[in-house]
Amino acid sequence: MKNVTTDSFETDVLKSDKPVLVDFWAAWCGPCRAVAPILEEIDGEQEKIDIVKGNVDEHPELAQRYQITSIPNMKVFQGGEVVKDIIGATPKAALAADLAQWL
């Protein structure tokens, strides 16, 4: 999975031709570390949605722009807009169900 930065966010996420799930996370966040391998599995199993990571400690302006107040916080972007919010660590089946329309 690609790591997005403040500088790459517009190109990698907002201007993407495909839907993009952004996993807003931090290294110190236990639930974030729990959901990371699940996202990697989903990313490797399909090609319809891109999954990227945005570190809120390294890029606090992204967290502020998208009002990230708790993590893990995942947002699906399509056409430059947030179309789905998923907050908290969830099992793979629940996450896949939340993303079903894009998988």
Language model features by range: what are they?
Residues T5, W25, V52:
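Conserved Rossmann-like nucleotide-binding pocket used by diverse enzymes
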